[in-house]
Amino acid sequence: MENLSKRFNALQDQLMNIYESAPDTLESQIEHWQTLRKEAVLLYFARQHGISRVGYQPVPVLAVSEAKAKQAIGMVLRLQSLQKSEYGSEPWSLVDASAETFRSPPENHFKKGPISVEVIYDKDKDNANAYTMWRFVYYQDDDDKWHKSASGVNQTGIYFMQGTFRHYYVLFADDASRYSTTGQWEVKVNKETVFAPVTSSTPPDSPGGQADSNASSQTPATTTDSTTRQSPRKQSQQTNTKGRRYGRRPSSRTRRTTQTRQRRRSRSKSKSKSRSRSRSRHRSRSRSRSESPRRRSRYRSRSGSRGRVALRAITTTTTTTTRRAGGGSPTSTSSTTSQRSRQLRGGGRGGSRQRARGRRSSSTSPTPSKRSRGESESVRQHGISPSDVGTAVYTVSSRHTGRLGRLLDEALDPPVILVRGEPNTLKCFRNRAKQRYTGLYKSFSTAWSWVAGDGTERLGRSRMLISFISFSQRKDFDETVKYPKGVDRSFGSFDSL
């Protein structure tokens, strides 16, 4: 107990010295956060051992000490990374390196030089709201390189330049729906009017709306840090548009093709059954009239069974070939079936020859959606050529293939997982997966973002792709890996990678 009190008092003295001297170097800020981390660890240790008070300081619960220690560790790592950059020699005060400043908009960024921005709604000076614009914002790119960017304000909101993009971290339209009745506001910086009153219905440079032709030619691309508030009708329209643009359509082409195939198969089966019934009646009559019923019935039963088996095989082959050609109709399928059924009435050797011909014709036809049995056997024996990897566009079946055959089939349609989140979170997740989950995946991509079709602004959060060798490997990865907080995932596959 006495040792804990002495160590705690020593840490308190170090913190008081830092606060009194108020250094403006990055080394001093790192030392400040290191001292806060030690203090949180000491209080955590005291609480674990049932100590409720260290000197005059009450010991908080374990969750509070743990959160403070983790916060201090995160700030130390970020400040050490910033210290290695070209901006490490700049003056950094306690306020610049504080957690409150780091978490203020734009969140998770270091910033300097606060400037007050006042927005007056409905031309009423009493109906105003104050915002903070930072003169400089420091951010990391996908390669963990630090950049220093200037911040600005316009009639849409407050932003900072991230390369060639305008990254908005304050949007005036968000608060206009709460404080304004007419949807108009006026922007003032240092008590000087910068932009005349504009309406929230058609903001000229809004990230979510259309921009003027003049404004779009003069204003660079924009991206936003928060979602603009719109009417439910507009939100539903945007949601449907995004679903059609980046998602799969509800009535996809594969579903329509599958339904069409089932209808054609049912028609061909019904027609083949009606023909087989008519043939069986004809044969029964001929048997009654014949002189040697036993021999003829045996011969006809054998030839009839062979003919029916061959007829079904050729009917399926003809239907598949017509369906692959894309221009056939049920009428053409039935006519082809009737012609071949006439040739098969003799049964026996003629039927086997026709079956062999049907197999040759079906194997030579193009098969984008389903491979023949001979092709599957050749794939299992000889493997897959590099040019065929990623060419399959159908879901792999687990029947009649075996483990090796399934793996080879899955190689034609490589599965992936798309994760969405903050860039730094995704990069940390990738580095942690490389250390802990080696063998559960094939490869990771870098962090990337979607770009609007009518502009260059980034849409939504950053994304990262994870590729796998097989669907079973993806399943093992998804069940084993713990995804970071705030990271979403979705499954998919590509023709090739």
Swiss-Prot record:
Residues 413-497 are annotated as: DNA-binding domain. Keywords: Activator, DNA replication, DNA-binding, Early protein, Host nucleus, Phosphoprotein, Repressor, Transcription, Transcription regulation. InterPro entries: E2/EBNA1_C_sf, Nucleotide-bd_a/b_plait_sf, Papillomavirus_E2_C, PPV_E2_N, Reg_prot_E2, Regulatory_protein_E2_N, Regulatory_protein_E2_N_1, Regulatory_protein_E2_N_2. Phosphorylated. Its main location: host cell. It comes from the Viruses. Residues 1-201 are annotated as: Transactivation domain. Belongs to the papillomaviridae E2 protein family. Plays a role in the initiation of viral DNA replication. A dimer of E2 interacts with a dimer of E1 in order to improve specificity of E1 DNA binding activity. Once the complex recognizes and binds DNA at specific sites, the E2 dimer is removed from DNA. E2 also regulates viral transcription through binding to the E2RE response element (5'-ACCNNNNNNGGT-3') present in multiple copies in the regulatory regions of the viral genome. Activates or represses transcription depending on E2RE's position with regards to proximal promoter elements including the TATA-box. This is Regulatory protein E2. It comes from Human papillomavirus 20. The lineage of its organism: Viruses, Monodnaviria, Shotokuvirae, Cossaviricota, Papovaviricetes. The gene is E2.
